[in-house]
A protein has these predicted regions:
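Substrate-binding cleft and catalytic face of glycoside hydrolase catalytic domains
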Residues: 54-216, 222
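Aromatic-rich peripheral "rim/lid" segments of glycoside hydrolase catalytic domains that contact
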Residues: 41, 179, 264, 268-275, ...
Length: 437
């Protein structure tokens, strides 16, 4: 009787549309550097982690995000010390590893030589002096060439951000020529700045559709605390017929306010843009040493500790799971880890980041890491085989109810869909282990 119930439950999962697939993971744009500097990673029990990507797969994660700069060698020393270094060769190599490990890849175009965010969207040094059609053409060519090289390298992205936190536009002009900055404003802007911005986005998206037609396009903003601006932005995108798939948001409680504000914003987006999915493409919370420049202090709600960080992650996942339009969750800089580094002579960044998912002193995985996988429990058929074996070691059955082995021997099963004794779907890919959902 039990296996019949399990099979019946699984059948409902198998019939879910592909759009029900959820992506959960993090931005790991400095992973290769931490590995090269011999950072020491441990699981929550203190056991060494030999390879971090398979470990993430065993934790239930299925997607990773990488940022890309045009020419990060042009960044300032301070920016390089913050982690600006991801040129195309770097991203191709790490992207290939991510794809080979079975994860989906979110590629984050910054369209700048350094950080791009609401306060700065500096035009790459090599593009300075370009405007109008010439700038649109350069953006199109660059995007197309990058994606061609990513595909050739075995690192084709599944999701593409055409710009990072572009609430106020992109490609404003050279960093030191403030008079040339051309900002787009969804509220109170000019027709000229709107046309300039949306034509740039259209050029980038055109290249994405041509080279990676199956990839989904994300428009990334961070104004969720200002619902009128948030809706005005995406209203403008729809009014110009911009071809995109997903609304991407940043959400850091110490910058953007309480979870209730995000909850309300997600409800508004679902009502107003019912045809669009929403992803939280950046989030995080400190487990130690909250910086002094935060806008909102929630330490009384979520203490600055491992337990406080996990409480935030749990509440975030619970809230997001109530929104059917939310299909992605990415923790920013989750790989940050100073354990094992000689910080005075052999460091990756110039400052510790204490909102990642590893303890900088012990190298152990933070409790919040275990919270993320719960976001993916309703995933549909698009699961990935990203690990080597399934925890628990319980019985495994075919869809017909025939016992064929145990979770510990999942790697020896032929490719296919199976059921674990606790009712989870087990997807076995060719040449991989399995991941239970």
């Amino acid at each position: 009787m039990r296996i019949k119930i399990i099979i019946a439950a699984l059948a409902s999962v198998l019939l879910m549309p592909a759009s029900a697939h959820k992506y959960v993971g993090g931005d790991i744009s400095l992973l290769a550097d931490y590995e090269a500097h011999s950072a020491q990673y441990y699981d929550a029990s203190g056991q060494p982690i030999a390879r971090l990507l398979p470990f993430f797969g065993r934790q239930g994660l299925n997607a990773m995000r990488l940022r890309l700069f045009v020419d990060p060698s042009k960044a300032t020393d301070a920016e390089k010390g913050e982690g600006v270094k991801q040129d195309l060769d770097y991203v191709k190599a790490l992207g290939r590893r991510i794809k080979d490990a079975g994860f989906s890849l979110l590629l984050d175009f910054h369209y700048s030589d350094t950080w791009a965010d609401p306060a700065k969207q500096f035009t790459p040094d090599a593009w300075r002096g370009l405007s109008g059609d010439a700038l649109n053409e350069r953006l199109y060519d660059y995007t197309r060439n990058v994606l061609e090289e990513m595909v050739a390298a075995g690192a084709a992205p599944d999701l593409i951000q055409t710009g990072n936190e572009i609430s106020y536009g992109m490609l404003w002009g050279p960093r030191y020529d403030e008079g040339s900055w051309q900002r787009y404003y969804a509220v109170g802007g000019t027709e000229a700045t709107e046309k300039r911005f949306t034509s740039l986005l259209a050029s980038a998206i055109k290249a994405c559709r041509e080279i990676c037609p199956k990839a989904r396009i994300v428009l990334h903003t961070e104004r969720m605390a200002q619902p009128s601006y948030l809706t005005a932005f995406y209203d403008d995108m729809d009014a110009t017929g911009l071809d995109y798939d997903i609304i991407g948001l940043s959400y850091y409680p110490y910058h953007h306010g309480p979870l209730q504000s995000l909850d309300a914003a997600l409800t508004t987006l679902a009502e107003r843009f019912a045809d669009k999915e929403v992803m939280i493409v950046e989030t995080g919370y400190y487990h130690a040493w909250q910086p002094s420049d935060v806008y909102f202090d929630y330490s009384s709600v979520y203490p600055i500790s491992g337990a406080g960080q996990k409480a935030f992650a749990d509440d975030l996942v619970d809230m997001l799971s109530r929104h059917g339009n939310v299909t992605g969750l990415f923790w920013w800089f989750m790989e940050a880890n100073e354990c094992g580094l000689d910080w005075s002579t052999n460091r990756v960044t110039d400052n510790w980041y204490n909102a990642g998912l590893f303890d900088n002193q012990t190298g152990r995985a933070m409790p919040a890491l275990s919270s993320l996988a719960r976001f993916n429990v309703t995933a549909g058929m698009a699961g990935h085989a990203v690990g080597g074996g399934v925890g628990g070691g319980g019985p495994v059955y075919t869809l017909g109810g025939v016992r064929v082995g145990s979770g510990n021997g999942a790697g020896q099963l032929p490719p296919g869909i199976y059921v674990t004794s606790d009712g989870r779907k087990l997807s076995i890919g060719r040449g991989h282990g399995g991941v239970a959902e």
